[in-house]
Amino acid sequence: MFVDLNSDLGESFGSWKMGNDDQILPVVTSANIACGFHAGDPLGILKTVRKAVELGVTIGAHVSYPDLVGFGRRNMDLSRDELIADVLYQISALDGLAKVAGSKVQYVKPHGALYNTIAHDQAQAAAVIDAIKMYNPELVLVALAGSNLVEQARAAGLKVVSEAFADRAYNSDGSLVSRRLEGAVLHDSAFVASRVVSMLKNGGVESIDGVFTPIQADTICLHGDTDGALEMSAAIKAELVKNNIEIRPFVNKA
């Protein structure tokens, strides 16, 4: 059994610091790097890209709605053409920086509100899928495990990797509990680490209302910007190793 570990990185902006990139990067196998639309400035993004390349971490474009003020967590009703252009712009920018650093973008993981919206909104999902195919149809799309997007993207010809979240609570339908609600984000490192292993071995987790919810995950997201993120990431990695679950990237870096 094996699994990929990913994290959202490159999200600092000028003097405003977000996350713990230098500490999280050695733990993960895939880096979802901001592209400037929800967070990240060019210099900070390039530094994160270079560090990822140095450590052999796979680079992914963490594309978002154009929402710096809201950190990409506000829904936007963009036209199809706008959304396609926004996604193309972001992938292109990050891929250019990755090329300078001696690597390339190998997957796309939408961020925040865009991630949640395209999990069920077929029109916006189609725009994101088409943008990825226009840029490079070999790019992998990271999507919420069990969401409609997984099958929609596969039917359109994209490679899709299903994602679960280590520190987020789930509703019984497999969706993430809104961050606005109490209990949406988990903070107990030992509990979260054990939960990740259980999810992988048993194919699901207990939802916030106590129902077993099936989740088949190929990659686990470790958030680097939550309280105790470093301790939690280390605990998860240690628990995976203890249970003989190999940690490796989901894409071929050749």
From Swiss-Prot:
What is the recorded function of this protein according to its Swiss-Prot or TrEMBL entry? Catalyzes the cleavage of 5-oxoproline to form L-glutamate coupled to the hydrolysis of ATP to ADP and inorganic phosphate.
Give the UniProt keywords, A-Z. ATP-binding, Hydrolase, Nucleotide-binding
**Catalytic function, reaction form:** 5-oxo-L-proline + ATP + 2 H2O = L-glutamate + ADP + phosphate + H(+)
SUPFAM superfamilies referenced in this protein's UniProt entry, alphabetically: Glycoside hydrolase/deacetylase
List, alphabetically, the InterPro entries matched: Glyco_hydro/deAcase_b/a-brl, LamB/YcsF/PxpA-like
Protein name, please? 5-oxoprolinase subunit A
Underlying gene: pxpA
Recorded GO terms, molecular function? 5-oxoprolinase (ATP-hydrolyzing) activity; ATP binding
Report the top EC class in one word. hydrolase
Q: Quote the EC number.
A: 3.5.2.9
Q: Outline the subunit composition.
A: Forms a complex composed of PxpA, PxpB and PxpC.
DNA damage found in the keyword field? no
Name the family the entry cites. Belongs to the LamB/PxpA family.
Under the heading NCBIfam families, the entry gives: PRK05406.1-3, PRK05406.1-5
Gene3D superfamilies xref list? Glycoside hydrolase/deacetylase (3.20.20.370)
CDD domains recorded for this chain? Answer: LamB_YcsF_like
Keyword Nucleotide-binding, does the record have it?
Answer: yes
* One biological process term in Gene Ontology: carbohydrate metabolic process
Q: Which residues form a coiled coil?
A: none
**Top-level division of the source organism's lineage:** Bacteria
